[in-house]
């Protein structure tokens, strides 16, 4: 079974999981930073400029990740516009500025002879500071990414333990807001 993404040449999720397992088997006391990111408004890029340009944005971001993060890093495309990375043998404190710079650096796609900017959002977490098991690391980084998306995109955020409760309550508020705006003939049932 393939372990690389055919479009970007990065690891796919299977390859990523295998590499991470190999790294962690060697040293359970290692510190690492997990990153989860995606391209802001990627559907708009595909709809506005076409899938060829969307693919170019994905390839560009993959190349940026490979050149920006060190050879010790494990980088993958999860699918769609989602990417994950594990920065091995480092801490959040050591990499915070580098992650911020990576997130905020300008990125462009070319369409009809013009350059058009595109942006990313990124969440990150540290093992073992933010989670007890490295398998939780990307989930924590994903919650941090979700928090960035809730507050305007094109930014990055470290994981905070409060994100778990905020994520749950945010989903509840969204359902409540939707139900308030429905005509009287609609009923919402919540299955237990």
Question: What are these model-derived regions, one by one?
Answer:
Residues 1-18, 37-51, 59:
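Conserved nucleotide-binding and Mg2+-coordinating catalytic segments in signaling enzymes
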Residues 62-63, 94-112, 140-142:
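Alpha-helical scaffold within the catalytic cores of cyclic-nucleotide enzymes
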Residues 1, 13-30, 62-70:
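Short regulatory alpha-helical coupling segments
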Residues 51, 96, 127-157, 166-175:
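Catalytic-core segments of nucleotide cyclases and related cyclic-nucleotide turnover enzymes
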Residues 47, 86-90, 127-128:
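Residue-level recognition of strand-loop junctions within catalytic nucleotide-signaling folds
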Residues 57, 84-102:
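Short helix/loop segment flanking the catalytic signature motif in cyclic-nucleotide metabolism enzymes
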Residues 39, 53-72:
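Active-site-proximal alpha-helical element of nucleotidyl cyclase-like catalytic domains
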Residues 74-77:
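A short pre-motif secondary-structure segment
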